Structures are given as structure tokens and as C-alpha cells.
């Protein structure tokens, strides 16, 4: 099982850290987790065709995690995808997909009629919405989904991926969460988001102290993520979804290592890790 970080950024645009997205691959399977800004460009860089993705899993419906959804769908059609899309996500995903597809319906129908491509199956989308907990098998991967705490977002999820006695945990967006620590127990790798304390300053009325406080409240601070990893007893900790996207890496490693006991891996776009 291989984890590739496609995008390690956040809503703020950064030319080195694209929007949140990850690719999990095995010998037979390709699963995409989230589809933030630039996901199709990152896949192209890897020479992974959108036509070959087996399923898309969404952690939650914040815009930075789904903004390139339609780009993913339309590019898969241009890449000669011949199978329907399987989308798994929180309650609200069906409505989201329906509205996005409706918004582009006229343009899409014009393309279909004029370009006369051999298949339109890429536009057949089957959406499955999560309950609080469950497992899904796709080829040689078992995906376990569980709720995390990203309030005021009502429905947010983390995932475990299982393949050949290996376990990968993806936190999704969450504040420190007991449920995550429960399901991440003894994971071979925990991919966790982080809010880096002290790296963002308030700016007049545009980014107030209250704004920073509220953003911090629904993410996991750098002073706590090491404790989360320690309690989870994960073998490796990889950090992603950096808020902000530019920061002092040495300081972050030092702060997290203090609680975790080991150095975390600072995630970078296109980083591949074999699990």
C-alpha cells in the first residue's frame, strides 16, 4: 500500500502546497481521498489517469476539500473513463454532487453532443453517504470510516485503510478527538492535519484574533498533535493540511517530537510513502 500526498495545503492558495487530497494505491486499487485545488494536475504529474481511479472518498464538504470535484469528473471523461464514478462521503454529498452537475449541465451536454466521444459513463455518479461508522471493501482494500470532530461542520470523517496486514489512518479535518485516537490505535502510519501555533498573525479587521481563535478551535494545534500520535501509538506520524502553509519546519518538528517521542514527517506535495 502506498500513500501519495497530492495536496498538503489549506484554503489559502500556495504554489507549493495544493489543496487537500491524497492517493492510496495498491497493486490493484486506486482510491482518492478529497479533491482539493490542483488535484488533477498532481495526478497528471504522477502519470495517474483520472480514468483509473476506483473511488473518491470525501472527509467532509468544506470547499478546500471538494473545490476541484467537477474538474476531476470532466477530466476523467477527457481521459476516456469508461466506468461510472463511485463517491463516498458525508450526509450532504448527494445534494452537493447533484448541484455541481446541474450547474455545468448545459455546457456538458453541448460538449457531449458536439465532441461525440464514445462513452459518457464518467458522468454516471453513484454516491454513498456515510453513517457514523462502517466498512467498505473495494478490491484489495478495506476502508473503515469513523466520525471526527470538526464542529461546526456537522459531518466529518477519518478513514482507516487496510491492506496485507498494514493500516493507514487519515484524520481528515478535526480538533483533538478521542474517536480518532481510538480508531488510529497502532496504525502503521497516521496522516494528521495540523494548525501551527504562533505562525499566523492577526491583520487588522481582515484576520482578527477572534478569527484565528475560531480557526484553531476546529483544527488540531501543533502543541497537541504529538500527544494525539502518542496516545494513538502510531508507528509513523505524517503531518499535512498545514495552517499556515509557510512555517518554521525545525520548530514544528521540535514541538511535535517533544510529545510524540519521535520526529514527525513533514508532508509535502507528491511525497510517496510505502506502508
State what each model feature region is.
Residues 165-169, 175-271:
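Cap/insert and terminal regions of metallo-dependent hydrolase folds
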Residues 1-180, 251-274:
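Binuclear metal-dependent hydrolase catalytic cores
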Amino acid at each position: 500500500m502506498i500513500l501519495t500526498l497530492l495536496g498538503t495545503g489549506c484554503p489559502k492558495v500556495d504554489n507549493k502546497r495544493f489543496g487537500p487530497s491524497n492517493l492510496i494505491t495498491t497493486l490493484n486499487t486506486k482510491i482518492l481521498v478529497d479533491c482539493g485545488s490542483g488535484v488533477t494536475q498532481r495526478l497528471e504529474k504522477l502519470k495517474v489517469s483520472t480514468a483509473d481511479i476506483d473511488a473518491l472518498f470525501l472527509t467532509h464538504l468544506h470547499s478546500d476539500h471538494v473545490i476541484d470535484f467537477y474538474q476531476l469528473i470532466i477530466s476523467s471523461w477527457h481521459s476516456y473513463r469508461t466506468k461510472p464514478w463511485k463517491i463516498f462521503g458525508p450526509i450532504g454529498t448527494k445534494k452537493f454532487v447533484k448541484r455541481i452537475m446541474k450547474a455545468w449541465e448545459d455546457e456538458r451536454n453541448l460538449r457531449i453532443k458536439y465532441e461525440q466521444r464514445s462513452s459518457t459513463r464518467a458522468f454516471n455518479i453513484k454516491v454513498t453517504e456515510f453513517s457514523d461508522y462502517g466498512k467498505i471493501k473495494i478490491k484489495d482494500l478495506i476502508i473503515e470510516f469513523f466520525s471526527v470532530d470538526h464542529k461546526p461542520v456537522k459531518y466529518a470523517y477519518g478513514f482507516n485503510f487496510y491492506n496485507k496486514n498494514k493500516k493507514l489512518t487519515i484524520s481528515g479535518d478535526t480538533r483533538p478527538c478521542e474517536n480518532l485516537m481510538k480508531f488510529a490505535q497502532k496504525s502503521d502510519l497516521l496522516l494528521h492535519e495540523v494548525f501551527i501555533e504562533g505562525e499566523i498573525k492577526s491583520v487588522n479587521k481582515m484576520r482578527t484574533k477572534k478569527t484565528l481563535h475560531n480557526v484553531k478551535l476546529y483544527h488540531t494545534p501543533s502543541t497537541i498533535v504529538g500527544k494525539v500520535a502518542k496516545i494513538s501509538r502510531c508507528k509513523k506520524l505524517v503531518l499535512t493540511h498545514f495552517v499556515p502553509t509557510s512555517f518554521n519546519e525545525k520548530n514544528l518538528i521540535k514541538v511535535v517530537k517533544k510529545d510524540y517521542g519521535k520526529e514527525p514527517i513533514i508532508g509535502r506535495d507528491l511525497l510517496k510513502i510505502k506502508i
